[in-house]
Amino acid sequence: MKIKSVELVKTIYKSNDKYPESLNGEFVFVGRSNVGKSTLLNILTGRNIAKTSKKPGKTASINFYKINNSFYFVDLPGYGYAKVSVEERARWRKIIENYFSKRAWNIKLVFVLIDGRHELQKNDEILLEWLKELELDFAIVMTKMDKLKNSERAKMIRYYKDLYGENYTIIPYSAITREGIDKIYELIEIFGGV
């Protein structure tokens, strides 16, 4: 898959903000704060489209990136970051819930990014169960895999495959080594991204 053009077309800050026109589907990137969503989007597009930071909570809005004038990459705010205000966390939750309920019909695949160094967190589990209830297809992207020793890595991959691997794709991924990028492109093509 080759990404020829990328354009940020809409940023959603509030649940009543208007969504962009629909295209040939949406590929959603969601996960805890500081798990690497923005870095992954930058790698996939070959451009610095999403702001990155070592400090969690950088993405505070829903960002719609038009890819090849055909479909969207949708970058959702990270969840689970304790150092933002209760009001800000509530706003993020509301716009994320609103997005999934209003745009589920146009979502091709949700990439759920999970820090592969750790077992499933409660917030991640709640999200995955909710995506199942909404009958949305998702793939689990295990981030930061380059930080694990081979034995730890094999253990964590086995852990996630035991939990979700029978029905969902598990992708070990590293921003450093680029492991997993080809699999993500392949899924985008399979699910209709051209």
Curated annotation (Swiss-Prot):
Annotated positions binding Mg(2+): 38, 59
Amino acids binding GTP: 31-38, 57-61, 75-78, 143-146, 173-175
InterPro entries in the cross-refs: G_ENGB_dom, GTP-bd, GTP-bd_ribosome_bio_YsxC, P-loop_NTPase, Small_GTP-bd
GO biological process: division septum assembly
The keyword Ribosomal protein is assigned to this record: no
Domain of life: Bacteria
Cofactors required: Mg(2+)
CC per GO annotation: cytosol
Domain EngB-type G stretches: 23-194
Family matches, as CDD domains: YihA_EngB
Keywords annotated in UniProt: Cell cycle, Cell division, GTP-binding, Magnesium, Metal-binding, Nucleotide-binding, Septation
GO molecular function, one term: metal ion binding
One Pfam family named in its UniProt record: MMR_HSR1
HAMAP family referenced in this protein's UniProt entry, alphabetically: GTPase_EngB
Cited NCBIfam families: GTPase_YsxC (TIGR03598), small_GTP (TIGR00231)
The family this protein is said to belong to: Belongs to the TRAFAC class TrmE-Era-EngA-EngB-Septin-like GTPase superfamily. EngB GTPase family.
Function: Necessary for normal cell division and for the maintenance of normal septation.
Protein name per Swiss-Prot or TrEMBL: Probable GTP-binding protein EngB
Species per Swiss-Prot/TrEMBL record: Thermosipho africanus (strain TCF52B)
Gene: engB
